[in-house]
Structures are given as C-alpha cells and as structure tokens.
C-alpha cells in the first residue's frame, strides 16, 4: 500500500521546526527516522498532510561527552548507540538495550528520539534509561525544558510533549564508582518481535553490600515502571531473603495487561523471574 501524498517541510533550525508544527497544527507531525510513522502512514492508520523533517536541522545526530554524562541527540540511530565505543564503555546495558530492537535494518534508521516520543509500552530502551537516571530535553514555543525520563511518559502512546514541542536530546549521567547495570529482554515470539517484557537493573556496591538498587520494567503496562520503595536494600547483602522481599515489592507495583506475547499471570511470573536474574547477575559481577 502506498502513502498518500504529503508535503515534506525542511526546517534549518529548531525554532523554524516548531513554527512549522504550530502553523499546521494537527495536520503536521515531526519526522525523525520514520520507521514507525512511515509504516503507519503506508497502512493508512495515520495521515498527516505535512511532515516536518528533523534531519535537516544541524546538531541533532551527535553524541557528546560532557563532564557529568553523555548527551545523545534525538536523531542518533539505534545502531549507532549499539555500536558506539563511548556508549559501550560507559553504559554497556544501554548499548545492549538498543541492540535488541527489531533487526539491523530497523536499527540503522530508527532514531532514539522518535523511539521515546512514540511511547509504545513495549520499547526496549526506556527501562535501561530509567535505571540510569536519564532525562530528556524538550524544545517548543516557550523555549527549552528538561524532564526526568520517569516523568516523560503519561500513558499508552502519550507523553508530556506539548503541541509543536520536540524531544531534542537525552542526557545520561555517568554511573558512580562500583556501579553496574544490566538489561534483559524476554521474547515469547521471534527475536525480531516486540518483547514480552524487558527488565533493567542498576546496582552500586561497597564492601560487598548494596549501596543502591534501581529496577525498571517495560512491556507490562501502558508506561514503563521504575520500582520504588527499595531503600530497605541499602547496606544489605543481596541474599535470598532480601531478593525475596525485592520480588514481592516489584509484584506489588506492576499491573501487567495481556497481549499477544503473554497473559497477565504469565507476565507477572516472568517479571519476578527476570528481576531475580538481573539482580543476581549484577551481584555476581563483583
């Protein structure tokens, strides 16, 4: 099926892009990598008479190392993040998450900003970015603002982005010393399909004890879940009793819904299993 005709607008700056989106309102949509948007338009599930091409704006496809972290431009592709020596050295779990999306052809085109702005509940990167403490930079008619990633997602395919506002980059702070993170994906269908669930965990240890633990899960509910109430783990060893309490805490904070990849009951069971696996994997790394 072919796409209905549309006008491709090519701004040269962020203010120009925002002005184009504001001018055309609901008839316009920002175009990044286009892997999802183009497919939906081909399927006639969506139609926009105007697409604002962000590829013509300089600076949105850069990975910049800053004093306190790494800033990733919205148009950086999944494949570049998967293979980047800087990302693999500083955030191997993040590289793993991006490397498990779809297939190489998709990863060569899809952009990190478009991935997050689409807000599909099955996305791989959000859990990994959440446990790493990422924040996103947004730009609109009122200028720039920064939002913690945990506050960015509002619901299924819904974010805090205002009309004519763009996600322009993602900032990931460097991990403290003696910290590690991991991302695990569980598939029930093909490897190229959406995951049944994804689990990310971040652990900081000192003298054999846990200083901080963060856990996030995706693919279960309309938004990714960053598990709260884990302060009880501080200064504890991750023995079977502590892990059992952790799993109960996770279980209380998730509300899986059924889809083609698993029932509510099955996803809840797999969430416990993969959180346990992720935490044990991190703990054993020292």
Segments (PLM) and residue ranges:
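C-terminal structural segment of proteins
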Residues: 1-286
């Amino acid at each position: 099926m072919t796409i209905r005709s549309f006008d491709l607008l090519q701004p040269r700056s962020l203010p120009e892009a925002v002005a184009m989106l504001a001018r055309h309102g609901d008839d316009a949509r920002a175009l990044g990598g286009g892997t999802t948007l183009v497919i939906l338009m081909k399927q006639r599930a969506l139609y926009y008479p105007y697409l604002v091409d962000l590829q013509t704006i300089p600076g949105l496809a850069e990975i910049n190392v800053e004093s306190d972290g790494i800033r990733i431009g919205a148009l950086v592709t999944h494949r570049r993040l998967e293979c980047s020596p800087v990302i693999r050295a500083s955030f191997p779990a993040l590289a793993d998450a991006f490397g498990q999306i779809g297939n190489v052809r998709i990863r060569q085109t899809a952009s990190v900003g478009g991935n997050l702005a689409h807000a599909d509940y099955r996305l791989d990167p959000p859990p990994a970015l959440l446990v790493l403490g990422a924040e996103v930079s947004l730009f609109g008619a009122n200028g720039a603002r920064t939002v913690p990633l945990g506050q960015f997602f509002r619901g299924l395919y819904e974010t805090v982005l205002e009309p004519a506002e763009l996600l322009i980059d993602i900032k990931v702070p460097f991990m403290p010393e003696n910290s590690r993170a991991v991302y695990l994906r569980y598939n029930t269908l093909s490897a190229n399909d959406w995951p049944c669930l994804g689990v990310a965990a971040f652990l900081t240890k000192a003298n054999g004890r846990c200083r901080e633990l963060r856990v996030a899960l995706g693919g279960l509910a309309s938004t990714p879940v960053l598990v709260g109430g884990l302060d009880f783990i501080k200064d504890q060893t991750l023995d079977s009793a502590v892990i059992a309490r952790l799993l109960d805490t996770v279980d209380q904070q998730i509300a899986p819904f059924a889809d083609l990849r698993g029932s509510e009951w099955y996803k809840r069971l797999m969430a416990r299993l993969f959180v346990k696996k992720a935490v044990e994997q991190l703990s054993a790394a020292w």
